[in-house]
């Protein structure tokens, strides 16, 4: 018993926790059924097509306003006021939804064409021609009917059944459908109409007098009238101009004339009577007779349209208790006219009536008055001396925000100008991460000046009241009025007497507080209406007759009871079944009995449907004669030319081959260019081919190959789409490997159910709520994928080729002629070369980039070819003549060049043979060279089930050339190559033994700790690659991915113990794997395989055999004669010539457009306009969003126009934008790194590369923290800094992780044209307090001194406190006769890109130099997670790592990091010279050195966005390093110098002289014009538009050397 109780309790707990699978499955099933029911209910909503083009926001407005409809937005028709026009159809359908179907309905002023299209034969439209525009509108409706009928006729169709009755009615008796009388005079007489009569008035009651409306309705015996009209509550406030923002329309009123018009477009206006509309809005009762009245009730307001209904009321039905005896005053006074005294009694008797009374009240809410206040504005006319005072509604929050802020101003700062400036600035909106951090107050800009004056006067009065209160109302000799004028006179200054006189004369200002009173308005206004009628008779309330409907329901209920015995009968839709039976005139009971008998095999009758659905059951017993009327007639038609769009519309994507019995002639192709947009929202079924193995190809072999290639794209596209559909159908059941390739987005929750590894997929497959699957072109916004309302899920694939396959299919199908591809007559030459034979080098030597084209399979190969071709500095290889195969096909016809003389295809045998044939034909070349390797990996057909016969894999060529000498492979690999190739393979490599293997105990043994990576890591399979990447290895690729690449050392890894088909003795993958290295290859494997046997055989290869494959390649030498003079620069004094215009011309040529930028008020514009920002976690004090006003000193104005900006004022917005663009914009590029071990290896490389061997160990006898080191540090500090340390006892450490943040007021100039398109962010400074700097400053100063003393100064320059002359001395021994590669590493966001790895490298360097462990750990923690506080701007945030720009180690730390970064990537043992300074570097290597992919390594290891440039001359720290045959000269960048001459921050003439002296110090070398020619070349290397600049260099020397002349470059700003 105890066991049973325990088991029961355990099972119950499992169920509660969700561990009971049975309960979970039931819950999921219940959730699924609920979702299906909900979606089915949505599908049953009326469907409305919205054809007009509207924006996404307007789409949302329409959808939310009318949830009763299922709206489909086609966006196919541009029109005026498209939203309002499109809403008309929704409004009409909403009104018609209120009316029982089939009841006689009068549409007052309606659109009879709309009712015809909907098949409403029970609607009569009263459409009077009140003006010419009405006639035009009626003719337009007739045109729409004619257009509809002509379309049907052109398509060979007839009017559908549901429209037939309405169209017949209009054709035979048009006056029954529409008349042209007013509703009050309509003569339409219904024929045998039973039931109630209804009316609708869609935007038409404006023109019907309100007093006649009730009588007109009663005349037509209307039971209920539904109306819709545009209105705004603000019209009740007697506003003369009211906006309807949602439909972009407006009302304007002039007296009783009310005009309605649409804004931002040229359309006709509508004029109505304001008083008449007001009656419809405010009245409740509309009398129709002495007995009946129509009562109005508002229903809803949707998109600026008010809906109401007028219900017919019989006053005789009123409860008798409301009747009372009273005197009819009109009858009384009429009788009194006849007799006053004698007939008084008779008059009283005659005037007695029984009256019925009722009353109503309507509240109108004014939403715009909520949180608003009424503010007075003052104005005066100078011509008429007439003063005016008006009141406006302004946001309460806005008013008191302004008043509270300016109330804090000091007396001198409280001026009208400062108040106006603040009001302008806070009107703009600040959005942080999509959330409004500072609200935007919708205040009319034209009111800001008047409001500012009111706020200013209000504050002045408040200041006075405070003074009076403080003095306890003791005013002395001055009156209250005099106090006010004293305050105003302080603000207006000398202008006060005239101002005071004018204000007094006009009585503009009153001292009393009520003149400046700010009041709160009412939110509601109530309108009353009263009904008085005479009691004459009494009747009973009639009941509604629903007997007929109940009888029909009983029949349907009995029929469904019969059907309930069938399987899946619970899924029958009763509404659909009843409608089908009614429309087909089938008895439901009979249909049900026959179906049950047939399904139970009791009737001996077989019906034609497969499943008993609602429609099939009704169709089963439809009358044969009526069924034949709607039968589908199959007719023969001519064979069409199939297009992409047509194919998908028919549910198929055609093949180029012959499938089944289809004739070949049916597969032709038209010449139109089809867009990829045609694929958007195509059904997935239209792209999936389920059977492709029976395709037959005809024609020559090349044609067959080309057709097969087209079909392979179709098959690939089909497989990709099919896989995504499968993922959508079974998201939860896919395995881990599949999860790594796909992604599934749940649209409702905006979350990834399966997160993809890649981002920004161009295409995907969409699952709708109706469980339909479509291929969709994906778009993105700040929230991710842009989705539609009917989307349920979106699937994407990292391996998906949907986009490229679609683009290539579009191109290739366009090239077909009558369904046949065109074969080029060009000569095709196959260049068959062994691995490493120099195929790419040969291509570069043979190609003429002006007339030839190079195509490669991969993007990296294309970039490599361009890089190698442009290595000389001259750009010859571009994206126009070096392309990938996919790019060439996808963008065919878009390039300026369409014909090439010769075509070079690198690794062409990796492509489909049909693809190669297409490339030759598309290039229109005379001869095509296909470079490849017949023994390496060929084209692989990756679509299972797609036929790719063996004879298709052989490329048809005219000639074959062989290359059998490898420049890469060592001797042992060359021995293996001789087994695989025909002919004798030779090698130029000096390496004899290169391959080895190691059997490992299991896959877990392979990790970065026990098996650190050596060289390039390769795998055979993608799964092994992903496993290695997950364990911490970087830069891992498969063998197939690196075909054609070369590496010094290779580590080949196999983790899969199961058999792998591509690892075989004759496998091309094995050949590629063995031939990638130049020095060594080591194979790590968990099992014995054929590759192990091959490597073991090669390990045993004798030296005698390896020497047989060697080819000696000698080196040619040339006799060199050194210059006679070395070590000193030739000096030629530069002549002082030129003018200001020379500098301006040179600047405009180098940076075109920069000088035209009017950026003086950019900062003001940003502060006064709306701004939307996205930030990381931070705390903002919005009270600091507007800085306190300061006195502005006008700076000197430069005569040279550059992109220099005015100094910025610090504040929340400026500081926050700077922080976003810098501190919050750190890249995340790095891969998985073993930080400690990798940092240790990097530091080893750093010490080995830069430090002298004898000084690589720290001197432990020297104390870092001593009195001498502190004194040396203090000597470099300013007195202010030392004063801050006066109260510091050095006993305890302050918070090392706390930093302050500030910005430099002057933006940094960039020597590019980015200023024309972006707002430059200010440079941020993050710094410690001086107390922390006093502790660590001396330490790092001493560490820096020791580091610089240990550096090999003959080869490396760490630019710290060096002069230009010292730089020239360092580079002076460069030999210009020795070919050199000058390298520069350009890194963007250098400081902010530094992360934990950089910190680890830097700390390890300091540790090895002798940094004490405890302080080192403190310093490390102070740079890990740090807090930034900006007290000026009111910002507080937290950042991880990053270089602190105001730290004691900022400069030397950056210099050390850039040096360590380069040492880890480049062969520093070969370097000639190297210089490092902050994030700048300049390296000189011997010509021809091979360098790794620096950009790739910098991204993955160092998190740097880096580019490595090869140049002729170096550029270092803003200076050009010009090496020549006598030494080296360093020129300051002349363009940078000119940019500084446009500075806008020079305060006065003394400041200008200091500025000139600093420029003279840095530009002294320009006095030597001996090397101006080389300087021109160096500048042109950076700025391609720069002209020869000797004229401007001389002009700079002229102005910099003359103090008086230099002053002419600026003018006094205060005088302007």
Curated annotation (Swiss-Prot):
Region of interest (Helicase), ranges: 830-1085
Segments for region (Methyltransferase): 50-458
Residues annotated as domain RdRp catalytic: 1380-1493
InterPro entries: (+)RNA_virus_helicase_core_dom (IPR027351), Alphavirus-like_MT_dom (IPR002588), DNA/RNA_pol_sf (IPR043502), P-loop_NTPase (IPR027417), RNA-dep_RNA_pol_alsuvir (IPR001788), RNA-dir_pol_PSvirus (IPR007094), ToMV_Hel_N (IPR049329), Virgaviridae_RdRp (IPR047310)
UniProt GO molecular function: ATP binding; ATP hydrolysis activity; mRNA methyltransferase activity; RNA binding; RNA helicase activity; RNA-directed RNA polymerase activity
Residues involved in ATP binding: 833-840
Boundaries of every Alphavirus-like MT domain copy: 72-281
Note: This protein is translated as a fusion protein by episodic readthrough of a termination codon. When readthrough of the amber terminator codon TAG occurs between the codons for Gln-1116 and Gln-1118, this results in the addition of the RdRp region to the replicase.
The protein, known as: Replicase large subunit
